[in-house]
Amino acid sequence: CWFIQRIGKKFASKDDVVDSRKILNKWKFLVPIAPIAGQTDFSKPIGFYYDGNTIVAKPGECSTESWLVAGTFDTEKEVKNFKSYLFTKISRFLLLQAVISQHVTRKNFMFVPDLGRYDKKITDDYLIKKFEISKSDWEYIDSRITKIKDE
């Protein structure tokens, strides 16, 4: 079971795990519920999610409420492609539009569309074409969200 970032992964008895959504045996992408803790100057670019604060959880792994299950999938490829989507500047910018505190919940993803299929890596270039984002809109998004290694 994945606990808070500082503790990491520890054993949890199956008797202590409630799987009401039937996702325990799926691949899961876990994101922290407080990804921007400590950032108070929102005039500077925001990062949100990156390799150091997210987890690809394997089937059979669970998490505490310190983590939000951002997506569940049947294959490792799908979860990694979904991760690439959430790591785009566009999806992180859309998430920022609904965030009013350091605490992120499922509701904050209201402007981040579910692409439905994650059979390939998702990039900002792909999303710019898909959503017909103008050059000026992209320049604004690019200025507000920090670049991360996986982009």
Which stretches of residues belong to each language-model region?
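Polybasic, glycine- and aromatic-enriched phosphate-binding surface used to engage nucleic acids
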Residues: 1-122, 126-132, 137, 143-151
